Amino acid sequence: MKASEMKKGSIVEYNNGTYQIRDIQRSSPQGRGGNVRFRFVMYSVPGGSKLEASFDADEMLTAVELLRREASFSYKDGEAFVFLDEEDYTLYTLEAEAIGDNAGYISEGLSGCYVQLIDASPVALQLPQHVVLEVVDTPPELKGGTATKRPKPAKLITGIEVMVPEYITTGERILVNTTTGAFGGRAS
């Protein structure tokens, strides 16, 4: 698979190891004939040691096919997250290092997740595209302040902060994109 086709959460083989891509940065070419490069922040699976590597857009990487099991978040056990397989009720425990920055999107009752397994042991988590989270703190809307729409910060129930439109109030449930971390609208 080409480096340009990789997505956040993909599992690849690199330097005789297995890694999960956690962040992707694209650099545009400078001048004529320059190549687009991708910088990946990867973590070893299992283990969690960090590795940064850069690749040309057409450079080939070997994607690892993992067994994926649909699961829902059950509870937190210390720093570990426990997920329940929705088919056979198996519990999968993932350490905080395996979850990484995605921990801010995991709330009580979250479903539609996929636990990724190597040899029947959980190594990574794939979140749904959008999650519903409750706003626990945001400044009130300024009436008549300006005709332009200004975003404001909102603290969510999981502790992360996202920028939301002025009309969002404390206590509302909103959609958050798990790839970009951006506001995606009011939850119905």
Swiss-Prot record:
GO biological process: peptide biosynthetic process
Pfam families for the chain: EFP (PF01132), EFP_N (PF08207), Elong-fact-P_C (PF09285)
InterPro entries from the UniProt entry: Elong-fact-P_C, NA-bd_OB-fold, Rib_uL2_dom2, Transl_elong_fac_P/YeiP, Transl_elong_KOW-like, Transl_elong_p-like_YeiP, Transl_elong_P/YeiP_cen, Transl_elong_P/YeiP_CS
One GO CC annotation: cytoplasm
PROSITE patterns from the UniProt entry: EFP (PS01275)
Gene Ontology MF terms in the entry: translation elongation factor activity
SUPFAM superfamilies, per the entry: Nucleic acid-binding proteins, Translation proteins SH3-like domain
Source organism superkingdom: Bacteria
Family the UniProt entry places it in: Belongs to the elongation factor P family.
Protein name: Elongation factor P-like protein
